[in-house]
Amino acid sequence: MSSGASASALQRLVEQLKLEAGVERIKVSQAAAELQQYCMQNACKDALLVGVPAGSNPFREPRSCALL
């Protein structure tokens, strides 16, 4: 039974390796350049870089009532 289990495990491993071999790969330098370009294009939308407008910030301290 151990040989049957190991044979099925090896079969699953072979199938997984076939799937991984078919994955399209790119060079790290190309991936880094694309990531840098994406970051530069979307920097204007990044709240950590440009901040959050005070009117739409859900985490700001609530104002107290002026009548009290």
From Swiss-Prot:
* Tissue expression as described in the entry: Abundantly and ubiquitously expressed.
User: Which residues does the record list as N-acetylserine (modified residue)?
Assistant: 2
CDD domains in UniProt: GGL (cd00068)
The UniProt subunit note reads as follows: G proteins are composed of 3 units, alpha, beta and gamma.
- Name of the protein this chain belongs to: Guanine nucleotide-binding protein G(I)/G(S)/G(O) subunit gamma-10
- Carrying Cysteine methyl ester, the residues are 65
Tell whether Nucleotidyltransferase is among the UniProt keywords.
no
Which InterPro entries does its entry note? G-protein_gamma-like_dom (IPR015898), GGL_sf (IPR036284), Gprotein-gamma (IPR001770)
Family assignment from sequence similarity: Belongs to the G protein gamma family.
According to its UniProt entry, the protein's GO biological process terms are: G protein-coupled receptor signaling pathway; signal transduction
